Amino acid sequence: MSKSEFQVIIVGGSIGGLTLAHCLRRAGIDHIILEKSSSPAPQIGASIGILPNGARILDQLQLWSEVEDYIEPLSTATIGLPDGFSFSSSYPQIINERFGFPIAFLDRQLLLEILYQRYPDRSKIRLEEKVTAVETSDSGATVTTSNGSVYRGGLVVGADGVHSIVRREIWRASKKLSSGLTAEFRCIFGISSAIKGLNVGEQVNALFDGLTIVTIHGKNGRVYWFVIQKLDKKYIYPNCPRYTKHDTTVAAEQLRNIQFYRDITFGQVWENRETASMTVLEENTFKTWHYGRLVLLGDSVHKMTPNIGQGANMAIEDAAALTNLLHNLQKISGTLSSTAAQIETILRQYRRIRYERVESIYRDSRFLVRFQARDGLLNILLSRYYAPYAGDLPADMASKTIADGVMCDFLPPPKRSGDGWKRYRRDGQLRGWRFHAMLCILMLAILYTWVGRTNLDSIVFSACGSLFQKLSVPT
């Protein structure tokens, strides 16, 4: 297959899929997107958090300036507990200052619209093309859609989400049939118009037992919100609950009277809703990322809860990392070879580059959703007796996660930046902090049984502070 014949077939016009198309276009690599929806930017009531590691890539692709028109950078986060105790952190503002890009939220629909409208050749984005079959061989890959169209290329990328047909074919072909995808939480999510008392640029995290209410207050007071609840048991994919609009309404009405911030109730958020939906929150990072000429990115291969805000950013990074490898092969060889051996080498490198980072962030996400839902005694203790006194620790931990992000190495780095990229980069040292965290948790349990809850405020902070302080020192 000659260079002119090599084509990347992207299954799914998701944020990851459209970002990959922009990356491939800038790298001069032929591609096409097959999207099952009739609209490139459907409104499903979801919001998207863009963190500096994702924003930096969008800036390289000359898309960030348009995204900025729709966002209000976060400056403050307030955390509230069931006993009425609350505290605030300026970690969002610190992140902005360190990296030159903010933590910000906007409608998922708006980001998709920007990615679609700013793509210059719409003929490469095929709507209403539902993929029904995917095949891979030594000589190429074939994709068939529901209308009978057949597409042939050198590589198929599954950017088709948690129910990925490309992943299903990888499992079948590689005989890896155990998914490992589980769900222990569900989420009601939506977008509401402005509510008096919820100030622009602020975020509220209200932590209850088995329940978390998160509101992010964006441009013009627009409220992006999540209500995360612990399920009655652990579900294993694909046998997870599916929810109707009626289910969403019933679940939301049951929470109507909960005061989550000062005198503001969830009922006020619900009454002001523009869109809302409910879904289970699947969790997993799959170990198998590719087979033959098939490869995965985004939610199709790593699914995490929204608490950490890195889901879309990981998909954006995946797109950049995969394009980097294809571009390097093209630069070295002068062509994109379609030999199975070279494709296999590229995909092995892609998985090796991405897996450890994604797995680390996935584990952070697993911890955070349980911490914010006060799931278990240890998380109750941490939320009440350590988190309020952690100072800049949340910003320092987030900085290390952000600084390790990849970008498009075939494009100039953004002109806007901050010293955080170099200062907090860990060069692959992703696991060290967990030892200290687990040790601190163990100490908390011992202290709890030793002194009881009465004196924990001072003792726990004193005993654990030195351990967590190690996390604040850039490596």
From Swiss-Prot:
Disulfide bonds: none annotated. Pathway: Secondary metabolite biosynthesis. It comes from the Eukaryota. The keyword Cell division does not apply. Its EC number is 1.-.-.-. It is an enzyme of class 1 (oxidoreductase). This is FAD-dependent monooxygenase janM. It comes from Penicillium janthinellum. The gene is janM.
